[in-house]
Regions:
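Residue(s) in the substrate-gating loop at a strand-loop-helix junction
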Residues: 8
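Short, flexible catalytic-loop segment of classical short-chain dehydrogenase/reductase
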Residues: 12, 47, 51-61, 104
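Active-site "substrate specificity/gating" loop of NAD(P)-dependent dehydrogenases
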Residues: 12-19, 24, 41
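Short C-terminal tail/terminal secondary-structure segment
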Residues: 13, 66, 87, 98-111
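Active-site helix of classical SDR
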Residues: 25, 33
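Alpha-helical segment proximal to the catalytic Tyr-Lys
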Residues: 38-42, 95
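A conserved structural motif in NAD(P)-dependent oxidoreductases
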Residues: 71-82
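Non-catalytic, hydrophobic alpha-helical segments
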Residues: 82-83, 89
Length: 111
């Protein structure tokens, strides 16, 4: 089986719009992902996470446009960018992947 947690870029770096409660919760989920990957391996369950950056959803406000210059791919992500990665982590193509957090940030996490 496979578990994929949804964390955030805000769990790893200061984000101008996230706030402390959100950031702390996502950081904790990152740690939980690693711990569960170790604990669930004996049950043949892989546990991974995805850490999206700016994704175009209803949660995104107009002020987020100011963040685009800090994204090397020069755009916000689309929901499909996240969904495709989650699908991969649930598939047999990632049968030897566990305890990993995949950044879906367009490179924003580099800065």
């Amino acid at each position: 089986g496979a578990i994929v947690n949804i964390t955030s870029i805000a769990g790893h770096m200061i984000h101008p719009f996230a706030g402390s409660a959100y950031s702390i919760s996502k950081s904790a989920l990152s740690a939980l992902t690693r711990e569960l990957a170790n604990e669930m391996a004996a049950l043949d369950v892989r546990v991974n996470a995805v850490a999206p950056g700016e994704i175009e959803t209803d949660m995104v406000q107009p002020e987020y446009e100011a963040l685009i210059p800090r994204i090397p791919l020069n755009r916000m992500g689309a929901p499909g960018d996240v969904a495709g990665t989650v699908y991969y982590l649930c598939s047999d193509d990632s049968a030897y992947v566990t305890g990993t957090e995949v950044w879906i940030t367009g490179g924003q996490h580099l800065f």
